[in-house]
Amino acid sequence: MSGTKNSMISDLWYKNAVIYCLSVGTYLDANGDGIGDFQGLIRRLDYLQGLGITAIWLMPFQPSPGRDDGYDVTDYYGVNPRYGTLGDFVEFTHGCQQRGIRVLIDLVVNHTSNEHPWFKQACRDPDSKYRNWYIWSEKRPKNAESGIVFPGVQKSTWDYEKTAGAYYFHRFYDFQPDLNTSNPEVQTEILKIMGFWLQLGVSGFRMDAVPFVISKKGADVTRAQEQYDMLRTFSEFLTWREGQAIILGEANVLPSTDLRYFGDAGERLQMMFNFDVNQHLFLALATSDSRPLKAALEATKPRPATAQWGQFLRNHDELDLGRLTERQRQAVFTAFGPEPEMQLYRRGIRRRLAPMLQGDRRRIELAYSLMMTLPGTPVLRYGDEIAMGDDLKLPERNCARTPMQWSTEPHAGFTKNKKPVLPVIREGPYGFNHVNVAAQRRDPNSLLNWMERIIRMRKEVPEIGWGDFSLIGCNSFQVLIIRYTWRNNSVVFIHNLESEPQEVRFTLRFPNEDKCELVNLLSEDHSFPNETGRHKILLEPYGYRWFRVGRLDHLLRRAPA
């Protein structure tokens, strides 16, 4: 039985992973052309291994005109020559395997580039099989201005194509025509794409825009009609080809819909980003009130045993606040993005975390400690580990996609070319002379070294990824207390969202634990209950604690992970 359990844990590797997202083009340039490449990324694998991450999620690197940072693909079976070759990619995956790091890649199959050969053929020849790979209408549909993803930038979801003599559907930009994913031929092609990259060593895919991928599309479609069984088809294919491979879905949907994406028995998506918790986490940070975050945690608690949430703070897109009420959204705008140039699409904030928190080290640590201890698997963005900033002079979301800052060398050590693919941040407190890996490596008290320690500790607490959680009540709504139990082991995490000290009092109220100590995993600040089993802890402003329930020798007697 023990062997079976450990085999299951190995298969469900994503339960206790730490995922690191990066763009090849902005990580490290090895050949000096100003653009990051796979050879540069290979040179930094030892750095990533030292950081402690266990999986790398690569943003799109396939051939593309680059009008949407690679999310407009022209060839699903290649590597953009700017980044290298398929041989370089295989060398990269082998290097990751040698270091115990898995690779996830973006799977962008809701749409292609309008320069993709499929779309060009569909436009030229109405009898081509590719014509039915896209969505067409002879007349401009009445709902052409509904369902716009990028308000203020995008004006319609239908545009006229002269060569085709018809209107085509595009949920996103007009240069990204939607694939007709209801077409069995398109679904077969998606499986073929996944199989190709699995053969080259990837462990799964971050599927872009999942709700749109599985929706029925067409001029006559007036309401959302999701085809959830499509996800089961994808998942079964992965299981057949590579048993441990996963799909991490981008599905910003209501909590009431989550189980339809996971599947009642976890037979659809293995992982999803928890957008609901993410938005309410920032609301909690903005208002110093844990209650909205608690509500989001409870709302997203139901999920199959094999399913997992991806918990994140910031990603490559804007901080989407679309699930909040107008009043809640304004509270977050006021706290973290008060200027119009900081906001995007009327619903989001286009900033990195550090400048949002005004560079306050205490708040930055609090935020990452929270993310690391929320139910699920933490997903970091490149540069998070050194508190990189943003460049609001760059358009839309590019402001938070600037090159990685490695050193004080010209162009932050990213490239020797005089013209990097995007400008590095030079000025202000987040300029590369102040914020870079080399300087923080030398400083034992730097955020980088703190992040390495917190990642190492997170991997030593599998209860977060595997266990059941419960919220513990206390005397302060500014404080969040969350407890996990797994294999007869328990851990408790406490976070003070307030800028003032908080004396927090609480009782665990679990059988036989009224006298249990709370052993601090990060310092010697242990907590001992009084005669009634009540704990009293003084938290400093934005303070946090990681505790294990049990006596001081309990760490030596834990069940193996």
What are the roles of these predicted feature ranges?
Residues 2-561:
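Active-site and adjacent substrate-binding regions of carbohydrate-active enzymes
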